Amino acid sequence: MRSSPGNMERIVICLMVIFLGTLVHKSSSQGQDRHMIRMRQLIDIVDQLKNYVNDLVPEFLPAPEDVETNCEWSAFSCFQKAQLKSANTGNNERIINVSIKKLKRKPPSTNAGRRQKHRLTCPSCDSYEKKPPKEFLERFKSLLQKMIHQHLSSRTHGSEDS
């Protein structure tokens, strides 16, 4: 079996298409992984802040609970906008302020998050019940866990959100 120049070109082109296809797939899955890593980091930050709950200003904050389907990103932004503050109590103040700042950083966006920004039917932040910092953090963690679960289940069911 002799290889002609035409066959070699086809083989090279096929190999390039396969190679480029794997690169595109890998880069899109890395975006999903970045999103999941960031969401898990947010849970860790919430857990860390729960350790310092007595060093937070005991102000009541809007704390979404039982968030409607497709309103998760709206509720997430309510948690990020809340004025969680350190009570300026000594050594822990810096740790608390850095953690609060990290909570307010945006996670890598997803298609679901972009679609949700256009929804006008989600409740406003002011409509949610206000809770003390401890319960606020517990509800925030619960929402993050729900969002991770939804993201993972959408990936396993083939309707990728990222």
UniProtKB/Swiss-Prot annotation:
Residues 105-126 are annotated as: Disordered. Gene3D superfamilies: Interleukin-15/Interleukin-21 (1.20.1250.70). It is found in: Secreted. It comes from the Eukaryota. Glycans are attached at N97. Disulfide bonds join C71-C122, C78-C125. Keywords: Cytokine, Disease variant, Disulfide bond, Glycoprotein, Secreted, Signal. Pfam families: IL15. The keyword DNA-binding does not apply. InterPro entries: 4_helix_cytokine-like_core, IL-15/IL-21_fam. GO terms for cellular component: extracellular region; extracellular space. Its main location: secreted. Expressed in activated CD4-positive T-cells but not in CD8-positive T-cells, B-cells, or monocytes. One of its GO terms (biological process) is positive regulation of type II interferon production. GO terms for molecular function: cytokine activity; cytokine receptor binding; interleukin-2 receptor binding. Residues 1-24 form the signal peptide. It is linked to Immunodeficiency, common variable, 11: A primary immunodeficiency characterized by antibody deficiency, hypogammaglobulinemia, recurrent bacterial infections and an inability to mount an antibody response to antigen. The defect results from a failure of B-cell differentiation and impaired secretion of immunoglobulins; the numbers of circulating B-cells is usually in the normal range, but can be low. Belongs to the IL-15/IL-21 family. PANTHER family: INTERLEUKIN-15-RELATED, INTERLEUKIN-21. Cytokine with immunoregulatory activity. May promote the transition between innate and adaptive immunity. Induces the production of IgG(1) and IgG(3) in B-cells. Implicated in the generation and maintenance of T follicular helper (Tfh) cells and the formation of germinal-centers. Together with IL6, control the early generation of Tfh cells and are critical for an effective antibody response to acute viral infection. May play a role in proliferation and maturation of natural killer (NK) cells in synergy with IL15. This is Interleukin-21.
